[in-house]
C-alpha cells in the first residue's frame, strides 16, 4: 500500500529505494478505490522496479497535487453557496485519478456517497449556508488584523511540499489542527478558538498509524530518512474560511435564535415606553392649556408630568441603543466577522442617529416660551370686504407645543412592532422561504401583505388613527391664536372637520389655519389623503373585477352566442338568395317583391360581416387564453403519446404470447392422439392462427 506525497530516491548501484515519509491526513484508508465498474490498484513500493522510477515519480507528483487540493474537514468555504444550483447536499469531487471524495465527508471513497446522506453535519451546514448566503465563504477575511496571523487556513488545503514542511519544522512552529468555531458566551458574539475537535483528533491518530505502516514498508526497500513533521504539521496558510463542527452549528443557531428573541422583546419594551411617554405628554398638554384647577406650566403637577416624560424618554433611548447593538451582534453572527466595526456601515449609523433624535424629543421641565406668529385672515373680521386686511401678531406660545408635536414621530416604533409580531415574521417556514427567494421580511413586505389580504380593514384603521392624530396636532398649533374666542369643544370640532375635508382634497374656506405649522399640517394631510385615495381606488377596482372563472363563463356564453348568430346570418343570406332566384325565374310578385328580397339580401350580408368582425375581435381580446390552450393541448398530446406507447408494448406482448402458444402447439401436436369425431389431419398453423 502506497501513500501519496512520499519521496522516492533510487540508487542505481544498489537498485534500492530511499523513502521520505511526510505526514498527512488520509481521507481514503483503502488500498483499492472503486469508481464505477473500474477498480484501480495503487502501486506498492515493494513492486516498483528501477525502470519504473519515472512512472512512480509522476504518480506521486499527481497524487501530491490532488491531495493538496483535498479538503480535510467540514469547512464553511468548501460548502456549496446559495448561488449554486445544487445546494442541498455537497457534490462529490473527482480528482485526476478517479478517486471520489466530498468536502463535508470524512469517509473513504467507497462509503463517501452513502455516509454523507446520513451525516447530520452535512445537512445542517448546507441549510445554514442556504439561509445565510455566501458571505460565510470569506469568514477569515472578516477577521481582525491581529488575528489574521494566527488563523490557519479555512479551505483546509494540505501543503505537502518539502519546502513548506521543512521550513515549519526548522522554525519550530507549533502544530495547528484548524480552528473550530465555538461559542463561549451565547449572550455575546462568537469567538474562534484553536481547539482540537474529536474528528480531527481521530484523523490525526489514523494518520500516525498510517505513517508507521509506511515507514515499515519503506524500510523493507531501503533506508529511511523521515522528517519529524508529524507533531509540527502546518497547513497552507491561505486564510480562507473556517472549519466548523456540529456543535458550532448548533451554537450559531442558538445565538441567532436568542438574538431574534431579544430583538422582539426590546421592540416591545420600546413601544410601551414610547406610549407611556406620549400619554403623559397628552395629559400634561391638555391640563395646562385648559388651566384645569389652575395648573399652568410652572405648577408642580406639570413639572412632575414632564419629569416622568423625560425619564421614559431616557429609558426609551437606552432600549434604542440596545436594539441596534443586538442588530450588530446578529449581523456578526450572520457574516462571521469578529470585529463589530466591519458591520457598522454608514447607512446603519444614519439610521441610528435619526431614530435617536426622533425618540429623544420630548417636553422638558422649564422649557420656557417662544414667539409664534399668527396670521388672522380677513374672514374673521367684521365690516365691508374692502376694509378687511390680513393682520399678523406675535403670541407667546410654550416651547412644549412644538416638542409635543415632534414627540409623535416615535410612532414609527409601532410599524416595527407590527413587523416583528406579524405572522410572516413569526412563522419560521415563511421566513425561510423568503430568505431562500432573496425576499426580506420587512415593513414593506408586511404592509403589502396586509393590503392584499385585508385592504378595507387596514385602510380604515390607518385613516381613523391618522385623522385623530392630525386633529390633535392642529389643535395644539391653533389653540393659542383664538385667545378665548371659541370654547374648546368648538375648537376640537372645527379641527376634526378641517382635517377630514382636507384629507378628502376638498376645501370650503370656512376654517383656515392661522399659523405656519397649521398650514404645514394641512399640506401634509392633503398629500397623505391623495395617496390613501389612490390606494382605495385601486383596491375597489380590484375587488369589482370578475374572477378568472367568472370571465371564463361569460366568454363561453358570448362565444356560443356569436357562433349561433353567425349560423343564423349565413342561413339568412342563403334564404334571401333563394328568394331572389325564385323571383327571377318566376313572374309572380313583380319587381316590387324582387327589390324587397334584394334589400333583405344586402341587410343579411351586412349582418354576416358584422358577426364575423365581432368574432374576430372576441378572439383577439381573449388571446391571453392561448397559453392555457397550448398547455392543455400539450398535456393531451403527452397523454395520447403515453397511451400509444402502452398500446405498442401491449401489442408486442401479445405477439410474444402468440408466438409462444404457436411453438407450444407445434411441438405438442405430434404427441397428442387424434380425438374421435374430428379430422385425422392436424390443424394447419395458419388456421390455428386465424382461430386464435
Curated annotation (Swiss-Prot):
Q: Which Gene3D superfamilies match?
A: 1.10.287.70
**Which example biological process does GO assign this protein?**
potassium ion transmembrane transport
Sequence ranges of Polar residues compositional bias: 667-683
Segments passing through the bilayer: 270-290, 313-333, 349-369, 401-421, 455-475, 520-540
Signal sequence span per UniProt? none
Q: Which UniProt keywords apply?
A: Ion channel, Ion transport, Membrane, Transmembrane, Transmembrane helix, Transport
What does the entry list as intramembrane? 492-512
The record ties this protein, via InterPro entries, to: CaM-bd_dom (IPR004178), CaM-bd_dom_sf (IPR036122), K_chnl_Ca-activ_SK (IPR015449), K_chnl_dom (IPR013099)
GO MF annotations in UniProt? calmodulin binding; small conductance calcium-activated potassium channel activity
Membrane topology category: Multi-pass membrane protein
CC per GO annotation: neuron projection; neuronal cell body; plasma membrane
Q: Which region ranges are annotated with the description Disordered?
A: 667-692
Tell me the compartments it is located in: Membrane
Record flagged with keyword Calcium: no
Quote the PANTHER family the UniProt record gives.
SMALL CONDUCTANCE CALCIUM-ACTIVATED POTASSIUM CHANNEL
Q: Which family does it belong to?
A: Belongs to the potassium channel KCNN family. SK subfamily.
| Subunit and partners | Heterooligomer.
Role description: Forms a voltage-independent potassium channel activated by intracellular calcium.
| Name of the protein in its database record | Small conductance calcium-activated potassium channel-like protein 3
**Annotated organism of origin:** Caenorhabditis elegans
Amino acid at each position: 500500500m502506497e501513500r501519496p506525497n512520499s519521496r522516492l530516491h533510487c540508487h542505481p548501484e544498489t537498485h534500492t529505494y530511499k523513502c521520505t515519509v511526510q505526514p498527512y491526513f488520509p481521507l481514503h484508508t483503502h488500498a483499492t478505490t472503486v469508481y464505477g465498474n473500474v477498480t484501480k490498484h495503487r502501486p506498492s513500493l515493494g513492486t516498483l522496479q528501477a525502470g519504473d522510477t519515472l512512472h512512480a515519480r509522476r504518480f506521486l507528483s499527481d497524487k501530491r497535487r490532488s491531495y493538496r487540493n483535498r479538503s480535510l474537514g467540514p469547512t464553511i468555504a468548501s460548502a456549496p453557496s446559495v448561488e449554486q444550483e445544487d445546494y442541498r447536499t455537497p457534490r462529490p469531487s473527482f480528482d485526476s485519478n478517479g478517486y471520489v471524495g466530498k468536502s463535508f465527508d470524512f469517509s473513504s471513497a467507497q462509503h463517501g456517497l452513502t455516509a454523507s446522506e446520513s451525516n447530520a453535519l452535512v445537512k445542517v451546514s448546507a441549510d445554514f449556508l442556504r439561509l445565510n448566503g455566501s458571505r460565510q465563504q470569506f469568514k477569515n477575511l472578516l477577521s481582525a488584523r491581529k488575528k489574521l496571523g494566527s488563523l490557519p487556513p479555512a479551505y483546509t488545503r494540505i501543503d505537502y511540499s518539502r519546502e513548506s514542511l521543512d521550513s515549519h519544522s526548522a522554525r519550530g512552529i507549533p502544530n495547528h489542527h484548524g480552528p473550530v468555531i465555538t461559542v463561549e458566551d451565547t449572550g455575546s458574539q462568537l469567538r474562534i478558538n484553536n481547539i482540537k475537535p474529536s474528528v480531527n483528533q481521530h484523523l490525526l491518530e489514523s494518520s500516525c498509524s498510517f505513517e508507521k505502516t509506511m515507514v515499515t514498508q519503506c524500510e523493507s526497500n531501503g533506508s529511511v530518512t523521515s522528517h519529524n513533521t508529524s507533531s509540527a504539521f502546518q497547513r497552507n496558510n491561505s486564510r480562507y474560511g473556517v472549519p466548523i463542527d456540529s456543535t458550532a452549528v448548533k451554537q450559531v443557531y442558538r445565538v441567532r435564535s436568542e438574538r431574534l428573541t431579544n430583538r422582539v422583546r426590546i421592540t416591545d419594551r420600546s413601544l410601551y415606553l414610547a406610549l407611556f411617554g406620549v400619554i403623559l405628554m397628552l395629559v400634561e398638554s391638555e391640563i395646562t392649556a385648559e388651566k384645569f384647577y389652575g395648573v399652568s406650566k410652572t405648577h408642580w403637577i406639570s413639572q412632575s408630568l414632564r419629569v416622568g416624560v423625560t425619564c421614559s424618554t431616557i429609558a426609551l433611548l437606552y432600549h434604542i441603543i440596545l436594539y441596534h447593538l443586538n442588530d450588530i451582534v446578529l449581523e456578526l453572527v450572520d457574516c462571521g466577522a469578529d470585529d463589530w466595526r466591519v458591520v457598522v456601515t454608514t447607512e446603519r449609523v444614519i439610521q441610528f442617529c435619526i431614530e435617536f433624535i426622533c425618540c429623544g424629543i420630548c417636553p422638558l421641565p422649564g422649557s420656557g416660551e417662544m414667539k409664534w406668529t399668527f396670521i388672522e385672515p380677513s374672514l374673521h373680521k367684521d365690516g365691508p370686504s374692502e376694509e378687511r386686511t390680513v393682520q399678523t401678531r406675535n403670541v407667546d406660545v410654550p416651547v412644549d407645543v412644538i416638542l409635543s408635536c415632534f414627540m409623535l414621530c416615535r410612532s414609527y416604533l409601532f410599524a416595527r412592532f407590527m413587523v416583528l409580531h406579524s405572522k410572516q415574521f413569526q412563522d419560521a417556514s415563511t421566513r425561510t422561504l423568503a430568505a431562500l427567494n432573496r425576499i426580506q421580511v420587512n415593513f414593506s413586505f408586511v404592509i403589502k401583505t396586509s393590503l392584499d389580504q385585508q385592504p378595507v380593514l387596514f385602510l380604515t384603521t390607518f385613516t381613523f388613527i391618522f385623522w385623530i392624530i392630525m386633529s390633535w396636532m392642529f389643535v395644539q398649533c391653533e389653540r393659542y391664536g383664538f385667545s378665548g374666542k371659541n370654547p374648546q369643544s368648538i375648537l376640537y370640532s372645527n379641527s376634526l372637520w378641517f382635517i377630514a375635508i382636507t384629507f378628502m382634497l376638498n376645501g370650503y374656506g370656512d376654517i383656515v389655519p392661522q399659523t405656519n405649522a397649521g398650514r404645514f399640517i394641512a399640506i401634509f394631510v392633503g398629500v397623505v389623503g391623495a395617496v390613501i385615495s389612490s390606494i382605495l381606488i385601486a383596491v375597489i377596482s380590484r375587488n369589482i373585477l370578475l374572477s378568472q372563472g367568472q370571465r371564463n363563463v361569460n366568454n363561453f356564453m358570448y362565444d356560443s352566442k356569436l357562433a349561433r348568430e353567425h349560423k343564423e346570418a349565413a342561413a339568412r343570406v342563403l334564404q334571401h338568395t333563394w328568394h331572389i332566384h325564385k323571383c327571377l325565374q318566376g313572374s309572380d310578385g313583380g319587381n316590387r317583391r324582387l327589390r324587397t328580397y334584394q334589400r333583405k339580401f344586402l341587410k343579411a350580408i351586412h349582418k354576416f360581416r358584422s358577426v364575423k368582425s365581432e368574432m374576430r375581435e372576441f378572439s383577439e381580446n381573449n388571446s391571453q387564453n392561448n397559453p392555457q390552450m397550448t398547455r392543455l393541448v400539450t398535456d393531451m398530446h403527452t397523454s395520447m403519446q403515453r397511451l400509444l406507447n402502452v398500446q405498442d408494448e401491449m401489442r408486442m406482448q401479445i405477439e410474444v404470447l402468440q408466438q409462444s402458444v404457436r411453438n407450444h402447439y407445434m411441438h405438442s401436436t405430434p404427441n397428442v392422439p387424434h380425438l374421435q369425431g374430428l379430422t385425422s389431419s392436424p390443424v394447419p398453423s395458419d388456421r390455428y392462427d386465424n382461430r386464435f
